[in-house]
């Protein structure tokens, strides 16, 4: 199994699939916002940024997947973004399941002054909703819970890919006597 993931990470198609899946999920988020008129909250915006990190990791890995530098850089960026996204989604689920006046998200995002994404791209990163509101659900789970599952999947996948990198490749053929 590890050799499969190592082989997949050494090819461009696996990285492009990672980037494509993140892009599709970003487009789905925009459909929910503009097509279904759901209002994104601060945590939703942060989760979009984390998903953008996974998209960026897929692009980095696709640049030169046979190079260990670009491969490891893509894995580390993707794993960091997916773990951060998982932690953000976990906090978002906590806001929804335990609403209280002292358990609320901030109204405005706290981006660095050198990277104010909410001012540069307000159509993507401007929050207008409340984190504790459940505006949409599917199969009894809120969107934040589905996002938690999504980031857990990305985290597990990228952790397996990272572990597969230290595995030595299989020899081409084995000889009993030399």
Swiss-Prot record:
Q: Which UniProt keywords apply?
A: Cell inner membrane, Cell membrane, Chaperone, Disulfide bond, Electron transport, Membrane, Oxidoreductase, Redox-active center, Transmembrane, Transmembrane helix, Transport
Which domain of life does the protein's organism represent?
A: Bacteria
S-S bonds: 41-44, 105-131
Q: Where in the cell is it found?
A: Cell inner membrane
Q: Does the keyword Membrane apply?
A: yes
Question: InterPro entries per the record?
Answer: DiS_bond_form_DsbB/BdbC, Disulphide_bond_form_DsbB, DsbB, DsbB-like_sf
Which residue intervals are topologically Periplasmic?
32-49, 91-145
> What molecular functions are annotated in GO for this chain?
electron transfer activity; protein-disulfide reductase activity
Q: Where are the transmembrane segments?
A: 15-31, 50-65, 73-90, 146-164
Q: In this UniProt entry, which residues form the Cytoplasmic topological domain(s)?
A: 1-14, 66-72, 165-178
Q: Which GO terms describe its cellular component?
A: plasma membrane
Its GO biological process terms? Answer: protein folding
Which Gene3D superfamilies does its entry note? DsbB-like
* Membrane topology term: Multi-pass membrane protein
- Write out the function statement from the record: Required for disulfide bond formation in some periplasmic proteins. Acts by oxidizing the DsbA protein.
Of which family is this protein a member?
Belongs to the DsbB family.
Q: Which HAMAP family match?
A: DsbB
Q: What is this protein called?
A: Disulfide bond formation protein B
Q: What is the lineage of its organism?
A: Bacteria, Pseudomonadati, Pseudomonadota, Gammaproteobacteria, Pasteurellales
């Amino acid at each position: 199994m590890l050799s499969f993931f190592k082989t997949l990470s050494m090819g461009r198609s696996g990285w492009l699939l990672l980037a494509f899946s993140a892009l599709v999920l970003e487009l789905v988020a925009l459909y929910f916002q503009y097509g279904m008129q759901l209002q994104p909250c601060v945590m939703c915006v942060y989760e979009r940024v984390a998903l953008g990190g996974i998209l960026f990791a897929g692009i980095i890995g696709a640049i030169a997947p046979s190079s260990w530098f670009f491969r490891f850089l893509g894995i580390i960026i993707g794993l960091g973004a997916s773990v951060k996204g998982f932690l953000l989604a976990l906090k978002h689920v906590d806001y929804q399941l335990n609403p209280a006046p002292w358990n609320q998200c901030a109204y405005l995002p706290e981006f660095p002054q050198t990277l104010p994404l909410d001012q540069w791209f307000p159509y993507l990163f401007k929050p207008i909703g409340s984190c504790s509101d459940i505006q949409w659900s599917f199969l009894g789970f809120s969107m934040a819970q589905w996002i938690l599952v999504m980031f857990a999947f990305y985290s597990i996948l990228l952790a397996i890919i990272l572990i597969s990198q230290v595995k030595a490749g299989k020899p081409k053929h084995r000889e009993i006597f030399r």
